[in-house]
């Protein structure tokens, strides 16, 4: 239904589908992975009763900035995507979209996102510049460091401190526990994603944590996931979250255990499924927070 709706936009403009694919709107998994931890922070910052304005601002902001990040990512990778089986048909790599068009769409999406942030307060506006900088820098990191997933984690977690400043103008130290938890989680699931392309990346000289971790990849991912849950548990104590939140963490832990088991053969398909599966862990943590506040 969702994809059919997007494809129907081709009736409005014959190239609409090219730009939908460029911004990955046809693949919402990235939206989910960014949305759940951001909304978790919005709920905690709002003490379980966030304003509708903040929910809409951060919800729409997630969609727009994730799309912007995909545009600049494909711009940065336009010369290497054609050499990777999974990405060879992307709009820029295949020539369906020009580099300047990708940059233009990136600029438009960032500008609209900034208009949303202007509806908050000055602290949140200033923090938003960090979000744009991280989104822009991430795609280029894989050329220079084996830790591009850490930069992605920093970018995907930036909405967390913004959610707190938007809610009350203050940024408590405990909010950074949520930030660190999400950064660790992101490095873990994006390493699964990088494992899908590891053989191709080795041939073309692209760096990633999947290459860095080598044969220890799955164990390191599981360790990162457990550390993430530990940070969430500590943050939950600071924010006085109880049983439902802990149940959400247990559900996430079971998700992580399944991912570790399911990738034991290290084939591309199972690694990609493990990456996709992570959004359920994020959703369970978010639902645990929502229910913990709602059922007090």
UniProtKB/Swiss-Prot annotation:
UniProt cross-references to InterPro entries, sorted A to Z: HB_polyprenyltransferase-like, Prenyltransferase, UbiA_prenyltransferase, UbiA_sf
Presence of the UniProt keyword Cell division in the record: no
GO CC aspect terms: plasma membrane
Record-level Gene Ontology MF annotations: 4-hydroxybenzoate polyprenyltransferase activity
EC class name: transferase
Pfam families listed in its UniProt record: UbiA (PF01040)
GO-annotated biological processes: ubiquinone biosynthetic process
Chief place of localization: membrane
Transmembrane regions listed in the UniProt entry: 28-48, 52-72, 102-122, 145-167, 174-196, 219-239, 241-261, 275-295
Biochemical pathway: Cofactor biosynthesis; ubiquinone biosynthesis
Membrane topology value: Multi-pass membrane protein
Required cofactor names: Mg(2+)
Subcellular location: Cell inner membrane
Keyword Transcription: no
Catalytic reaction equation(s): all-trans-octaprenyl diphosphate + 4-hydroxybenzoate = 4-hydroxy-3-(all-trans-octaprenyl)benzoate + diphosphate
Alphabetical UniProt keywords: Cell inner membrane, Cell membrane, Magnesium, Membrane, Transferase, Transmembrane, Transmembrane helix, Ubiquinone biosynthesis
Its EC number(s): 2.5.1.39
Protein role: Catalyzes the prenylation of para-hydroxybenzoate (PHB) with an all-trans polyprenyl group. Mediates the second step in the final reaction sequence of ubiquinone-8 (UQ-8) biosynthesis, which is the condensation of the polyisoprenoid side chain with PHB, generating the first membrane-bound Q intermediate 3-octaprenyl-4-hydroxybenzoate.
Similarity comment text for this entry: Belongs to the UbiA prenyltransferase family.
PANTHER family per record: 4-HYDROXYBENZOATE POLYPRENYLTRANSFERASE, MITOCHONDRIAL, PRENYLTRANSFERASES
NCBIfam families: ubiA_proteo
HAMAP family tied to this protein: UbiA
Protein name, as recorded: 4-hydroxybenzoate octaprenyltransferase
Annotated organism of origin: Pseudomonas putida (strain W619)
